[in-house]
């Protein structure tokens, strides 16, 4: 069954621990508040892409249930698709046990099952929440198979988050010319790094995209998470809730979809040195020499 072309298929990518699932769920909750009909397809083996929507530890995954039944064809849509906050439809694809098989298989199996069983009916946005620092064929599947059309990379001013963002941009570029996938922007999930906004705006420019929004750091996010809720539900009148609404509105109205221009590692390191995130080799050598001298005394 083909997917209605009017449905906007977006994906959130980002390195592990960056706050990708938290950012995506809070943003999608805000979009649902604005009347958008949302389907979330969790593509992370942790199966934590929907827990704030459902107020639960982790949703039972398509792959887990299929293994219990013997085949994915034995499942009913209602068993794997639950309804959460503001009517958001929630599915987790799941993955195999650690060290066994390819986690990408769960993504492929789940998406095919959902398409064939009508999960994409009556929705405005389908959102794929994808583990982003593993750039393998399975995790790239929403891009490779021309499912996700708009990619949003959750990053911060930390070196590894930026490194992952550049890698993801490289993955998007690989499939941009054969399909319709485009980069919608970088979402800076703040880590309070010095000059963070300027740094991510500079990286975005180098990648031929935009920093679509800067999400400030606020403990209310953790308070809501402890109660397994989105900020929009836990503290709807909070400043942080409004930040997610601003981001949601920007995504809904975003037409700035570009083919990215990933940079070489040397250029990324030069950028990090320029902003004081990374020491130059010369300065690092001086620091090591100074440390060695002080120890010998």
UniProtKB/Swiss-Prot annotation:
Post-translational modification: The reversible ADP-ribosylation of Arg-105 inactivates the nitrogenase reductase and regulates nitrogenase activity.
Domain of life of the organism encoding this protein: Bacteria
The protein's Enzyme Commission number: 1.18.6.1
Cofactor comment text: Binds 1 [4Fe-4S] cluster per dimer.
Class of this enzyme: oxidoreductase
A Pfam family reported for this protein in Swiss-Prot or TrEMBL: Fer4_NifH
Reaction(s) catalysed (UniProt annotation): N2 + 8 reduced [2Fe-2S]-[ferredoxin] + 16 ATP + 16 H2O = H2 + 8 oxidized [2Fe-2S]-[ferredoxin] + 2 NH4(+) + 16 ADP + 16 phosphate + 6 H(+)
GO molecular function, one term: ATP binding
Annotated family: Belongs to the NifH/BchL/ChlL family.
NCBIfam families: nifH
PANTHER family linked: LIGHT-INDEPENDENT PROTOCHLOROPHYLLIDE REDUCTASE IRON-SULFUR ATP-BINDING PROTEIN
Described function: The key enzymatic reactions in nitrogen fixation are catalyzed by the nitrogenase complex, which has 2 components: the iron protein and the molybdenum-iron protein.
Protein name (Swiss-Prot/TrEMBL): Nitrogenase iron protein 2
Organism annotation: Nostoc sp. (strain PCC 7120 / SAG 25.82 / UTEX 2576)
